[in-house]
């Protein structure tokens, strides 16, 4: 706040504009205070990419071999395979039937990759929450949400970090045999009609 009178309150906004509001709004409405973000260890990123549900599948041995070659996934794939193998053996699971027992999926491995990728970035604050999670499936696919805090708080560099992360995510999705869900566009309709 920059000025408080009986009839008005002048507030400097995050973008340096000044807003005049009546005092009763301070009690009746909510306001976003950017000071907490400035004083904290980072600025939050909370964005999703919708994955096409038709591209989710159990991992084949060939897929797992490919994923083991990814530096950020090698340990995860090996440890998870050991846990799954032990579970299936302990419970006498007949693995000749695909739905029996536990198996890794390309979506689960992708989620593990994204988590490891975020934690490897120098601009992500490792002391604050950093997670990748699936949200409720919708008619637009499965939202895969990246939730983390960027250590850079200034707007332009923050947007750059966020864009770099999502550029990378969009580029590597095909490596996991997954597809992004995207509503049909004019080009899609032209393909169908021709």
Where are these regions (language model features)?
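Soluble accessory domains appended to multi-pass membrane transport proteins
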Residues: 1-94
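Long, non-transmembrane cytosolic or organellar matrix-exposed soluble domains/tails
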Residues: 69, 73, 78-194
């Amino acid at each position: 706040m920059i000025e408080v009178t009986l009839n008005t309150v002048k507030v400097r906004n995050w973008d340096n504009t000044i807003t005049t509001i009546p005092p009763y709004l301070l009690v009746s409405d909510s306001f976003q205070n950017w000071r907490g973000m400035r004083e904290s260890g980072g600025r939050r990123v909370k964005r999703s990419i919708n994955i096409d549900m038709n591209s989710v599948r159990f991992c084949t041995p060939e897929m797992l071999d490919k994923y083991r070659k990814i530096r950020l996934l090698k340990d995860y794939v090996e440890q998870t395979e050991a846990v799954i193998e032990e579970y299936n053996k302990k419970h006498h699971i007949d693995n000749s039937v695909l739905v029996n027992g536990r198996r890794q999926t390309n979506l689960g491995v992708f989620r593990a990759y994204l988590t490891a990728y975020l934690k490897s970035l120098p601009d992500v604050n490792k002391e604050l929450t950093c997670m990748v999670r699936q949200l409720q499936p919708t008619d637009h696919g499965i939202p895969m949400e990246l939730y983390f805090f960027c250590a850079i708080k200034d707007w332009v560099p923050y947007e750059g970090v966020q864009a770099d992360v999502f550029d990378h995510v969009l580029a590597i999705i095909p490596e996991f045999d997954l597809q992004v869900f995207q509503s049909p566009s004019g080009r899609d309709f032209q393909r169908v009609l021709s």
